[in-house]
């Protein structure tokens, strides 16, 4: 039942407008930004400048905001394959308000009605075949024939969900022994715009406890934290001491007493007044910053904006919030490991599509307003009038910022991050679900240390889909299939917070005012109450109960009871939280089991939202923080094995293992039956598999798109099915035999049947973009030149449609002309071809030509080519059994079974044992069983569910296959049945027609073709360009590059004894040959000056030198020079050896032996 409930979550839920679960939270986030948040951001009414003691003000107001999105939602747009973008217009009014005796006089300085539909253009979620979603490209030939696809630079191509830098928990850091810091961020709520950010730091040095300060750069005073708390809460030191010591470990109480005592040096000074003391610090900070505002405004900004996330709270509540932070700080010093560290996902929120654009829109709006303010200021300073340039008004930077985002750059200050390349359909789902980190958060040093699977990532992140190499090796980033990211609109946020506070205030006032010895309650870190310790468990249980029955009209609230001496109840309702469902355990009993029979009857007819509504206590949505601070059993089977007493310790139970995998890992089969590395390698190879795109390939001008004939996998998981990966396909079923074949399939080599290839097996179509930029004067040049490269061009200078391009053919005309400075030449103008050529090794047909005319002519050509498997192409199974075609055999060369069937592919059987991929055998057994019984007892086609990770025993699958054969072929005897179940066949040798002595494992398998194609990588050249430094062939086939001759290549030739070949490759060419003179005294290379060769070292010492001329490679000289530059001296020594000569070989009589025994005479 737990598996069925997990599957229900993955399925579409139309009642909640969930049509595609993998990307649903992304669509909701994007729609919230366009439909709601953008208007909130743009609704500005702000004073820019004020004069004459605020009697004259310059006020900016943005109104008449019109957002024109499509009539349908982004979710429906994605399903129907329609484009989704939005146009935004607004009006900017700049007015001058003057307070006179007669009242307020308002005059308009400037007003701009933004009727231009391009003022803000929200990029496409899904778009047509334009390269840039912000500009309309023009198709020259031919016109668009229709068809929609996910655009190259549309929103769904934004690669990863970035982790926010700011943390929701304070960060504890050990600066040095006995010195610590506790830094935290305070961000204003979503309804406060513009957003205010404040970052504070509490420092503590155990040797100088009187300097336990809280500070913030230029936004707050530096003050003793105890003094500030006393100032805010207006209580004595005993009250503060009782709060800090209540329920704390004994070892921390000594430190608390010392901190309180050290603060008395300030508080018990003569004639001390705490209000005057704080006021003096404010004045001192005012003088230090040299603020241009008045002292009253400075004081108000400093104190009112202290802790912006509690902007509407009283000073007392802010003080108690600081007191709670100080309590955590002290506890951290002694129990660091029990506090969420900075790598914990408990501390972080995740940016989704909508949040990307929300942050960018906020930043660009502030830049826009700042530019207007600066223009008015300069105009007033220089001309004495308040005017603003129309150019400043009409050029907001939204479109430029959005375009930068789609190019992989989030902000100007942030480094670029990887946008995903759309190699396969799976990456539409997998990459936008992954969570990435800023470049400075992933240190290169982590390459050399083992990355641990952080406890906070358990169940929410996929442990299998991790990079296997590079600086991000082992970085857990893919969300599990059940995980999503929370979204909430501003109005919903305010209503939900008010509803929660209303519920909290239903408790007796005395029970929620235990600020001295109670547990504080925070909503998004905003302290709202402190509850009686005796009521904590009752409050949390009742809150969870009300949450599940949708009392607050939101099922994604997170509530965490943080015990362990920190005494806090944290309620989280904001966006960016990782959430997923869990099974509820109540008083030691799994609620699912109490209504199991009723659920079993209805499970096929209800949706996930129906379960939440009609059976609210079966499943609860937990955010990651609530999960960490709850007791969760890892599976239902483990929970049922526990004793009754142990069961009562748990709050929740997790779903089966398959739901902890990501969508890429879910395409694999039985990874828990294989060795660990196979899961990691399998995920990497699944991303490289060639799939069938769901969009019109002919209109998609993009790099390296391949199309495979669609064939749905028979053995799959529910996540693969509901995510549409199975329908879009990423492989084909082939008949595989596990055996050795004449030594051809050693190691990774595989043998493929020629007739299988000729019939279209694993055949693909490659659609490739070829793009060139040509100066417009070269493109329009009418000069004629004789070049065979232009044979495929049309009269307009572009390559013809349906032309077959060969290596060396030009894609577009590019003729450069020059004038010779020679008066004796009649025709002193020469023209020559500088066009870029088609460089692929294979011919391909021109499918589309697109031209964009700007300052240059940008030509994009889409070519199509059918590509059959050839020697060197790579393939893999879903268990990471990667292989390379080593031999293509005809059918007559291959072994056959009793029915004359020959295998399509032969794989080395030892690979199963060496790589420990037992699940590959199970997949073949199940696929073979499906082939004999593809329909269930109701006559419906039923794919076989074999999840990526499962707790099912292998014998269960064997028994399932056995029943399939017994049902389909009931007259099989026991031995024949076992042979069929285990796919064991007697094969016959094609040369002798005799059976092999051993049965061969042969059966159907879903096989994947990878993007690593021989013709894309093979490089052939005799001579060409070389790099200046090492004088080896440069890289890149487009640049006429070749393969570098390195150490391994050299060692191969040495092993073959090909000394002359090595000499020819490394030394004999003019560029590589290098004569050097070496001093036999010191081993230095001699210096050549004015045609004289001498050793610098020995000459300075007046020593006689003997220079010996040697010939070596240029690379050797470069190596010696680099070593010398690093202070490492290398001596070249000479050993005298006598010359070696090969002795004469023995003469061998090669005449036939029959002639030796007969006299020919």
UniProtKB/Swiss-Prot annotation:
Gene Ontology MF term list: DNA binding; DNA-directed RNA polymerase activity; metal ion binding; ribonucleoside binding
Claim: Chloroplast is one of the keywords in the record: no
UniProt keyword Transcription present: yes
GO biological process: DNA-templated transcription
Pfam families: RNA_pol_Rpb2_3 (PF04565), RNA_pol_Rpb2_5 (PF04567), RNA_pol_Rpb2_6 (PF00562), RNA_pol_Rpb2_7 (PF04560), rpo132 (PF12415)
Listed GO CC annotations: DNA-directed RNA polymerase complex; virion component
Enzyme Commission identifier(s): 2.7.7.6
Subcellular location, record wording: Virion
Enzymatic reactions: RNA(n) + a ribonucleoside 5'-triphosphate = RNA(n+1) + diphosphate
Protein origin, superkingdom: Viruses
Keywords, in A-Z order: DNA-directed RNA polymerase, Metal-binding, Nucleotidyltransferase, Transcription, Transferase, Virion
Assembly with partners or alone: The DNA-dependent RNA polymerase used for intermediate and late genes expression consists of eight subunits (147) kDa, (133) kDa, (35) kDa, (30) kDa, (22) kDa, (19) kDa, (18) kDa and (7) kDa totalling more than 500 kDa in mass. The same holoenzyme, with the addition of the transcription-specificity factor RAP94, is used for early gene expression.
Reported function: Part of the DNA-dependent RNA polymerase which catalyzes the transcription of viral DNA into RNA using the four ribonucleoside triphosphates as substrates. Responsible for the transcription of early, intermediate and late genes. DNA-dependent RNA polymerase associates with the early transcription factor (ETF), itself composed of D6 and A7, thereby allowing the early genes transcription. Late transcription, and probably also intermediate transcription, require newly synthesized RNA polymerase.
Family: Belongs to the RNA polymerase beta chain family.
Name this polypeptide is given: DNA-directed RNA polymerase 132 kDa polypeptide
Source organism of the structure: Fowlpox virus (strain NVSL) (FPV)
């Amino acid at each position: 039942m737990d598996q069925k409930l997990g599957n229900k979550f993955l399925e579409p839920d139309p009642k909640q407008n969930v049509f595609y679960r993998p990307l649903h939270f992304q669509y909701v986030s994007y729609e919230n930004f366009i439909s709601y948040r953008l208007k909130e951001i743009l609704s500005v009414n702000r004073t820019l400048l004020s004069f004459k003691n605020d009697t004259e003000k310059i006020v900016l107001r943005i109104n008449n905001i019109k957002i024109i999105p499509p009539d349908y939602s982004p979710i429906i747009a994605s399903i129907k394959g329609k484009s989704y973008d939005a146009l935004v217009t607004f009006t900017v009014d700049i007015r001058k308000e003057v307070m006179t005796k007669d009242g307020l006089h308002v005059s308009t300085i400037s007003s701009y009605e933004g009727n231009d539909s391009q003022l803000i253009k929200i990029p496409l979620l899904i778009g047509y075949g334009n390269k840039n979603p912000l500009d309309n490209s023009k198709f020259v030939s031919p016109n668009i024939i229709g068809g929609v696809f996910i655009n190259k630079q549309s929103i769904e191509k934004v690669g990863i969900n970035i982790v926010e830098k700011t943390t929701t928990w304070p960060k504890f850091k050990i600066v040095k022994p006995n010195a610590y810091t506790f830094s935290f961020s305070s961000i204003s709520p979503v309804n406060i715009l513009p957003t205010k950010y404040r970052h504070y730091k509490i420092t503590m040095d155990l040797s100088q406890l009187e300097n336990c300060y809280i500070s913030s750069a230029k936004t707050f005073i530096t003050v003793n934290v105890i003094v500030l708390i006393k100032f805010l809460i207006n209580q004595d030191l005993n009250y503060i001491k009782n709060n800090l010591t209540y329920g704390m470990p004994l070892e921390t109480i000594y430190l608390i007493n010392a901190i309180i005592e050290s603060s008395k040096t300030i508080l018990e000074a003569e004639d001390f007044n705490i209000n005057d003391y704080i006021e003096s610090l404010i004045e001192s900070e005012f003088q230090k910053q040299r603020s241009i505002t008045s002292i009253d405004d400075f004081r108000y900004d400093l104190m009112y904006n202290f802790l912006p996330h509690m902007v509407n709270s009283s000073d007392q509540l802010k003080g108690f919030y600081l007191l709670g932070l100080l309590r955590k700080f002290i506890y951290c010093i002694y129990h660091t490991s029990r506090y969420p560290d900075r790598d914990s996902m408990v501390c972080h929120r995740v940016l989704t599509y909508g949040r990307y654009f929300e942050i960018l829109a906020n930043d660009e709006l502030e830049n826009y307003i700042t530019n207007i303010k600066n223009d008015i200021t300069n105009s007033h300073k220089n001309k004495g009038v308040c005017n603003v340039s129309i150019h400043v008004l009409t050029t907001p930077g939204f479109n430029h910022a959005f375009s930068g985002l789609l190019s992989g750059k989030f902000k100007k200050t942030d480094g670029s991050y990887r946008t995903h390349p759309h190699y396969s359909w799976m990456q539409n789902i997998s990459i936008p679900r992954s969570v990435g980190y800023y470049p400075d958060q992933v240190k290169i040093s982590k390459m050399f240390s083992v990355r641990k699977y952080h406890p906070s990532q358990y169940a929410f992140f996929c442990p299998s889909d991790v990079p296997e190499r590079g600086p991000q090796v082992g970085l857990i980033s893919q969300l599990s299939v059940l995980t999503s990211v929370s979204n909430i609109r501003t109005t919903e946020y305010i209503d939900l917070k008010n509803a929660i506070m209303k519920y909290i205030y239903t408790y007796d006032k005395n029970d929620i005012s235990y600020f001295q010895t109670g547990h504080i309650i925070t909503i998004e870190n905003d302290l709202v109450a402190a509850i009686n310790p005796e009521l904590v468990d009752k409050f949390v249980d009742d809150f969870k109960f009300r949450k599940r029955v949708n009392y607050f009209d939101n099922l994604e609230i997170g509530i965490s009871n943080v015990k362990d001496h920190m005494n806090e109840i944290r309620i989280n309702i904001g966006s960016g939280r990782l959430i997923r469902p869990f099974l509820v355990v109540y008083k030691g009993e799994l609620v699912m089991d109490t209504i199991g029979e009723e659920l079993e009857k209805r499970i096929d007819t209800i949706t996930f939202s129906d379960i939440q509504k009609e059976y609210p206590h079966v499943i609860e949505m937990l955010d990651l923080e609530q999960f960490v601070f709850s007791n969760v059993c890892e599976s239902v089977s483990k929970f049922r094995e526990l004793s009754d007493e142990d069961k009562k310790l748990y709050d929740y139970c997790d779903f089966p293992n398959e739901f902890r995998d990501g969508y890429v890992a879910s395409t694999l089969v039985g990874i828990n039956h294989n060795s660990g590395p196979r899961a990691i390698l399998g995920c990497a190879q699944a991303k490289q598999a060639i799939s069938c795109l769901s969009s019109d390939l002919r209109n998609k001008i993009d790099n390296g798109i391949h199309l495979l004939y669609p064939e749905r996998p028979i053995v799959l998981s529910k996540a693969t099915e509901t995510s549409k990966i199975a329908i879009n396909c990423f492989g084909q079923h082939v008949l595989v035999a596990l055996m050795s074949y004449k030594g051809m399939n050693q190691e990774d080599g595989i043998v493929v049947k020629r007739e299988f290839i000729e019939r279209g097996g694993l055949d693909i179509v490659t659609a490739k973009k070829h793009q060139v930029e040509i100066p417009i004067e070269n493109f329009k040049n009418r000069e004629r030149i004789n070049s065979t490269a232009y044979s495929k061009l049309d009269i307009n200078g572009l390559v013809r449609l349906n032309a077959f391009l060969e290596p060396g053919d030009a894609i577009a005309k590019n003729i450069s002309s020059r004038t010779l400075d020679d008066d004796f030449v009649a025709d002193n103008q020469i023209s020559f071809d500088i066009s870029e050529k088609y460089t692929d090794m294979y011919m391909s047909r021109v499918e589309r030509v697109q031209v964009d005319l700007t300052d240059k002519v940008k030509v994009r050509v889409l070519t199509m080519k059918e590509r059959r498997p050839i020697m060197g192409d790579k393939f893999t199974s879903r268990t990471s059994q990667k292989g390379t075609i080593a031999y293509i055999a005809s059918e007559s060369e291959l072994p056959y079974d009793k029915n004359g069937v020959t295998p399509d592919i032969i794989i080395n059987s030892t690979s199963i044992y060496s790589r420990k991929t037992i699940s590959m055998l199970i997949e073949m057994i199940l696929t073979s069983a499906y082939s004999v019984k593809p329909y269930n007892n109701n006559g419906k086609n039923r794919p076989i569910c074999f999840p990526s990770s499962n707790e099912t025993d292998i014998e269960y699958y064997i028994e399932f296959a056995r029943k399939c054969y017994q049902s389909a072929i009931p007259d099989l005897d026991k031995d024949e049945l076992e042979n069929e179940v285990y796919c064991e066949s007697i094969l016959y040798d094609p040369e002798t027609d005799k059976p092999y002595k051993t049965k061969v494992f042969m059966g159907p398998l879903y096989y994947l073709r990878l993007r690593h194609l021989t013709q894309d990588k093979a490089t052939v050249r005799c001579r060409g360009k070389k790099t200046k430094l090492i004088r080896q062939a440069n890289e890149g086939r487009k640049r006429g590059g070749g393969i570098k001759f390195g150490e391994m290549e050299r060692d191969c030739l040495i092993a073959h004894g090909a000394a002359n070949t090595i000499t020819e490759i490394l030394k004999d060419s003019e560029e590589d040959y290098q004569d050097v003179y070496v001093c036999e005294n010191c081993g230095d290379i001699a210096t050549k000056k004015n045609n004289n060769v001498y050793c610098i070292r020995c000459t300075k010492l007046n020593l006689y030198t003997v220079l010996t001329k040697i010939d070596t490679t240029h690379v050797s000289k470069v190596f010696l020079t680099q070593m010398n530059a690093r202070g490492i001296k290398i001596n070249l020594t000479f050993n005298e050896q006598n010359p070696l000569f090969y002795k004469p070989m023995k003469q061998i009589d090669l005449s036939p032996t029959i002639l030796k025994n007969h006299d020919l005479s």
